Amino acid sequence: MTALLIDGNALSKTLRAQAAERAAALTARGHQPGLAVILVGANPASEVYVRNKIKACEDNGFFSLKDAYPATLSEADLLARIDELNRDPKIHGILVQLPLPAHIDSHKVIEAIAPEKDVDGFHVANAGALMTGKPLFRPCTPYGVMKMFEAHGIALQGANAVVIGRSNIVGKPMAMMLLDAGATVTICHSKTRDLAAHTREADIVVAAVGKRNILTADMVKPGATVIDVGMNRDDAGKLCGDVDFAGVKEVAGYITPVPGGVGPMTITMLLINTIESAERAAAAA
C-alpha cells in the first residue's frame, strides 16, 4: 500500500484564492487587509521566509509593509516600532520574524504586539485562549495542519494522535487543536523513553522536532496519517522533513511531502489570520 499524498501546494492555492476574494471585498469597502513584517538582522533563512510572506500578500491583494533592521537595533527601538504599528489602522497583522538577535528578548517583543494584531498566534492572550478553544488567532502551522485533515476528511474524533515535539509554535498548539477536535493526544519529545511504542498505536502522527528520520516505517501503524512539519537538509543538501518519507509512505494511509506539504500552508494560514483580523476591524469601524 502506498500512502495518499496530502498536497499542501494544491490546498494552499484553493485557500489563497478564497483569501483573495475576501481581501477584494474588504478593499472595495475601504478596508484593505494589511500585514507588517519586521526582520531584524541578516539571517538568510529568515530573509527567504519574509520574502515569501510579502509575495503572498502582494499576490492576493493585501497591503504589506516590510521593516528590515540591522542586527544592532536596540530592543527599545523595536518595541517603539511595534507600538506604532499597534496604533496604525492600516495594519491588521504584525509579525516579527524569529529568531531575534541575542540582546533582544523575544518574549517581551511578542507580548508587545496587540493581541488583536497577533496573526502568528504567539501572544500569551491568544496562546491562553487556545486552551479554552476561543483564540482570536491560531498559530499558523498547526492551523494549516488542521485544514489538511479537514480537506481530506480525516476523522479526528476518537482518534489516537501522537505529536512529536513540544514547541510553543507547533507542538503544544497542535496538541491543543487535536484535543479540541476530539482526538486522544500524546505529546512525545526528546526525553520520551520509547517513541516507537507511542507512534505504533497512533492513527495520526505529527512530527515537528527538526530532526531527520525521527519517524521510520517500522514505527508507523498501517494506514495511519503522517504529517511532517520538519524542515531539514539531507546529506546532499536537499530539503527534507523529520519523516523517512520513502519508507513511511509504503505503510501510512496519508502522508505530507517535504517540500510541498505543511510549508505552503503556514503562509496561507497567515493570510487567513490577517483577513480575519481585517474583517473584525472593518465590522467595528
UniProtKB/Swiss-Prot annotation:
PROSITE patterns from the entry?
THF_DHG_CYH_1, THF_DHG_CYH_2
Coiled-coil boundaries: none
Q: Name one GO molecular function term.
A: methenyltetrahydrofolate cyclohydrolase activity
Pfam families on file: THF_DHG_CYH, THF_DHG_CYH_C
Q: Name one GO biological process term.
A: L-histidine biosynthetic process
Which pathway, metabolic or otherwise, does it act in?
A: One-carbon metabolism; tetrahydrofolate interconversion
**EC number(s) from the headed UniProt entry:** 1.5.1.5, 3.5.4.9
> InterPro entries given for it?
Aminoacid_DH-like_N_sf (IPR046346), NAD(P)-bd_dom_sf (IPR036291), THF_DH/CycHdrlase (IPR000672), THF_DH/CycHdrlase_cat_dom (IPR020630), THF_DH/CycHdrlase_CS (IPR020867), THF_DH/CycHdrlase_NAD-bd_dom (IPR020631)
* Alphabetized CDD domains for the sequence: NAD_bind_m-THF_DH_Cyclohyd (cd01080)
Any one of the GO CC terms: cytosol
What is catalysed by this protein? (6R)-5,10-methylene-5,6,7,8-tetrahydrofolate + NADP(+) = (6R)-5,10-methenyltetrahydrofolate + NADPH; (6R)-5,10-methenyltetrahydrofolate + H2O = (6R)-10-formyltetrahydrofolate + H(+)
Q: How does it assemble?
A: Homodimer.
Q: Which family does it belong to?
A: Belongs to the tetrahydrofolate dehydrogenase/cyclohydrolase family.
Name the job this protein performs.
Catalyzes the oxidation of 5,10-methylenetetrahydrofolate to 5,10-methenyltetrahydrofolate and then the hydrolysis of 5,10-methenyltetrahydrofolate to 10-formyltetrahydrofolate.
Q: What is this protein called?
A: Bifunctional protein FolD
Protein's gene: folD
